[in-house]
């Protein structure tokens, strides 16, 4: 099957599963990016068999209700990619607003201080604490969680 045919099939399958058609496009773009395939140049070409198998397996996981972030293994948060799996919650867009609010409060009230401590308790993927520290290196961010292993 061509990239185009597989994309159309995946769109229909995910639409029927209530996941939305856009996830099929995101999956295909990401899987092609990982393999240095220019999707837009290859749309009418047959998809390599190994990629087809991986892509359809990912579509099937989403049909079963697995979120896109878990299927891809990462989620974008505040412009940064964070590893996610079933052990952590996927960061939500609303939480990005929280990071923006904390950074704004820092600018308004604490920017003249040299050592401002921030604690990110139950950090999960680390998205909040790491994003805060990347955006404002003056913050001394401490992240903690109860999970004692990593993947």
Give residue spans per PLM region:
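Conserved small/polar residues in nucleotide/adenosyl-binding loops
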Residues: 150-151
